[in-house]
Protein backbone atom coordinates (compact mmCIF):
# COMPACT_ATOMS: atom_id res chain seq x y z
CA UNK A 1 0.00 0.00 0.00
CA UNK A 2 1.28 3.43 -0.92
CA UNK A 3 1.54 5.76 2.07
CA UNK A 4 1.05 9.52 1.70
CA UNK A 5 4.27 11.53 1.90
CA UNK A 6 2.36 14.45 3.43
CA UNK A 7 -0.48 14.10 5.89
CA UNK A 8 -3.50 16.36 6.04
CA UNK A 9 -6.95 16.30 7.50
CA UNK A 10 -8.57 15.81 4.05
CA UNK A 11 -6.92 12.38 3.88
CA UNK A 12 -7.51 11.38 7.51
CA UNK A 13 -9.57 8.28 8.25
CA UNK A 14 -11.72 10.30 10.68
CA UNK A 15 -11.18 13.99 9.84
CA UNK A 16 -13.62 15.28 12.44
CA UNK A 17 -12.36 13.16 15.33
CA UNK A 18 -9.58 15.72 15.96
CA UNK A 19 -7.06 12.98 16.74
CA UNK A 20 -3.49 14.14 17.18
CA UNK A 21 -2.14 11.16 15.23
CA UNK A 22 -2.67 10.90 11.46
CA UNK A 23 -4.45 7.75 10.28
CA UNK A 24 -4.79 7.69 6.48
CA UNK A 25 -8.08 6.55 4.94
CA UNK A 26 -7.78 2.83 4.35
CA UNK A 27 -7.68 1.66 0.74
CA UNK A 28 -8.80 4.90 -0.89
CA UNK A 29 -7.05 7.38 -3.14
CA UNK A 30 -8.54 10.02 -0.81
CA UNK A 31 -5.79 9.14 1.66
CA UNK A 32 -3.45 11.18 -0.56
CA UNK A 33 -5.41 14.42 -0.07
CA UNK A 34 -3.54 16.77 2.23
CA UNK A 35 -5.92 19.59 3.01
CA UNK A 36 -4.96 22.23 0.48
CA UNK A 37 -7.83 23.59 -1.64
CA UNK A 38 -7.39 23.83 -5.39
CA UNK A 39 -6.44 27.03 -7.21
CA UNK A 40 -9.97 27.22 -8.68
CA UNK A 41 -11.45 27.06 -5.18
CA UNK A 42 -9.09 29.79 -4.01
CA UNK A 43 -10.14 32.08 -6.87
CA UNK A 44 -13.78 31.71 -5.81
CA UNK A 45 -12.79 32.36 -2.22
CA UNK A 46 -10.98 35.52 -3.27
CA UNK A 47 -14.15 36.84 -4.90
CA UNK A 48 -16.25 35.89 -1.87
CA UNK A 49 -13.91 37.70 0.51
CA UNK A 50 -14.47 41.05 -1.18
CA UNK A 51 -17.47 41.57 1.10
CA UNK A 52 -15.05 42.00 4.00
CA UNK A 53 -13.51 45.13 2.46
CA UNK A 54 -16.27 47.25 4.01
CA UNK A 55 -16.70 45.49 7.35
CA UNK A 56 -15.28 47.08 10.49
CA UNK A 57 -13.90 44.15 12.48
CA UNK A 58 -14.17 45.99 15.81
CA UNK A 59 -17.88 46.61 15.19
CA UNK A 60 -18.31 42.98 14.20
CA UNK A 61 -16.56 41.76 17.35
CA UNK A 62 -18.61 44.09 19.55
CA UNK A 63 -21.86 42.81 18.01
CA UNK A 64 -20.66 39.21 18.39
CA UNK A 65 -19.94 39.75 22.08
CA UNK A 66 -23.36 41.36 22.62
CA UNK A 67 -25.14 38.43 20.96
CA UNK A 68 -23.02 35.87 22.82
CA UNK A 69 -23.69 37.55 26.16
CA UNK A 70 -27.42 37.62 25.40
CA UNK A 71 -27.33 33.92 24.46
CA UNK A 72 -25.50 32.96 27.66
CA UNK A 73 -27.83 35.09 29.78
CA UNK A 74 -30.98 33.67 28.20
CA UNK A 75 -29.78 30.07 28.58
CA UNK A 76 -28.70 30.57 32.19
CA UNK A 77 -32.09 32.14 32.96
CA UNK A 78 -34.23 29.55 31.16
CA UNK A 79 -32.23 26.32 30.80
CA UNK A 80 -30.79 25.44 34.20
CA UNK A 81 -29.79 21.91 33.10
CA UNK A 82 -27.06 23.40 30.92
CA UNK A 83 -23.69 24.51 32.31
CA UNK A 84 -21.50 27.06 30.53
CA UNK A 85 -18.39 25.30 29.22
CA UNK A 86 -16.91 28.31 27.41
CA UNK A 87 -14.91 30.96 29.23
CA UNK A 88 -17.21 33.58 30.73
CA UNK A 89 -14.78 36.33 29.69
CA UNK A 90 -15.77 37.33 26.15
CA UNK A 91 -12.15 38.18 25.29
CA UNK A 92 -11.20 34.55 25.98
CA UNK A 93 -14.22 33.03 24.26
CA UNK A 94 -14.42 34.20 20.66
CA UNK A 95 -17.69 33.69 18.77
CA UNK A 96 -18.42 30.14 19.90
CA UNK A 97 -20.43 29.46 23.02
CA UNK A 98 -20.46 25.95 24.47
CA UNK A 99 -22.60 24.35 27.13
CA UNK A 100 -22.35 21.01 28.90
CA UNK A 101 -25.42 18.81 29.03
CA UNK A 102 -25.54 15.13 29.92
CA UNK A 103 -27.65 14.40 26.84
CA UNK A 104 -25.87 16.91 24.62
CA UNK A 105 -25.76 14.82 21.46
CA UNK A 106 -29.47 13.99 21.48
CA UNK A 107 -30.39 17.54 22.46
CA UNK A 108 -28.34 18.94 19.57
CA UNK A 109 -30.11 16.58 17.16
CA UNK A 110 -33.47 17.79 18.49
CA UNK A 111 -32.36 21.41 18.06
CA UNK A 112 -31.24 20.75 14.49
CA UNK A 113 -34.62 19.18 13.73
CA UNK A 114 -36.18 22.48 14.85
CA UNK A 115 -33.84 24.57 12.66
CA UNK A 116 -31.38 25.61 15.38
CA UNK A 117 -27.98 24.57 14.07
CA UNK A 118 -25.05 23.93 16.38
CA UNK A 119 -22.61 21.09 16.77
CA UNK A 120 -21.64 18.51 19.33
CA UNK A 121 -18.27 17.61 20.84
CA UNK A 122 -17.75 14.52 22.99
CA UNK A 123 -18.45 13.77 25.65
CA UNK A 124 -21.29 16.23 26.36
CA UNK A 125 -20.61 19.63 24.76
CA UNK A 126 -23.19 21.54 22.73
CA UNK A 127 -21.45 24.28 20.73
CA UNK A 128 -23.04 27.26 19.01
CA UNK A 129 -21.50 29.72 16.57
CA UNK A 130 -22.74 33.23 17.26
CA UNK A 131 -22.21 35.62 14.35
CA UNK A 132 -23.87 38.97 13.77
CA UNK A 133 -23.37 38.46 10.03
CA UNK A 134 -26.27 35.99 10.06
CA UNK A 135 -27.97 36.31 13.45
CA UNK A 136 -29.74 39.03 15.41
CA UNK A 137 -31.10 39.26 18.94
CA UNK A 138 -34.49 37.86 17.89
CA UNK A 139 -32.76 34.78 16.43
CA UNK A 140 -30.89 34.28 19.70
CA UNK A 141 -34.04 34.55 21.80
CA UNK A 142 -35.99 32.23 19.50
CA UNK A 143 -33.20 29.62 19.64
CA UNK A 144 -33.33 29.66 23.45
CA UNK A 145 -37.14 29.34 23.42
CA UNK A 146 -36.77 26.24 21.23
CA UNK A 147 -34.01 24.84 23.45
CA UNK A 148 -36.09 25.43 26.58
CA UNK A 149 -39.05 23.62 24.98
CA UNK A 150 -36.82 20.65 24.09
CA UNK A 151 -35.52 20.46 27.66
CA UNK A 152 -38.91 20.87 29.36
CA UNK A 153 -40.62 18.28 27.15
CA UNK A 154 -37.54 16.02 27.09
CA UNK A 155 -37.91 15.90 23.30
CA UNK A 156 -34.21 15.00 23.18
CA UNK A 157 -35.15 11.56 24.60
CA UNK A 158 -36.98 10.53 21.40
CA UNK A 159 -35.39 7.48 19.76
CA UNK A 160 -34.61 9.35 16.52
CA UNK A 161 -32.25 11.67 18.41
CA UNK A 162 -30.34 8.89 20.19
CA UNK A 163 -28.62 7.24 17.23
CA UNK A 164 -25.18 8.70 16.59
CA UNK A 165 -24.50 9.68 13.00
CA UNK A 166 -21.15 9.02 11.38
CA UNK A 167 -19.24 11.84 9.73
CA UNK A 168 -17.68 10.84 6.41
Annotated model-derived regions:
Residues 51, 74, 78, 150:
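Short alpha-helical functional segments enriched in proximate histidine and acidic residues
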Residues 25, 41, 89-91, 120-124:
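Short, flexible turn/loop "capping" segments at secondary-structure junctions
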Residues 65-72, 76-114, 123, 130:
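Conserved PLP-binding catalytic core of the aspartate aminotransferase-like
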Residues 1-63, 69:
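Active-site C-terminal subdomain of aminotransferase-like
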Residues 35-39, 101, 137:
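Short, solvent-exposed loop/helix junctions and linker helices
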Residues 110-168:
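PLP-dependent enzyme catalytic core of the Aspartate aminotransferase-like
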Amino acid sequence: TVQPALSGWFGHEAPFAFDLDFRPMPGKIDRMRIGTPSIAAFSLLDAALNIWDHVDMEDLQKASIELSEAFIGEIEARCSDLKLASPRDANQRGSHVSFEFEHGYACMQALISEGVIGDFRSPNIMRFGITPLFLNLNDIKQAVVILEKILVTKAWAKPEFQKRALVN
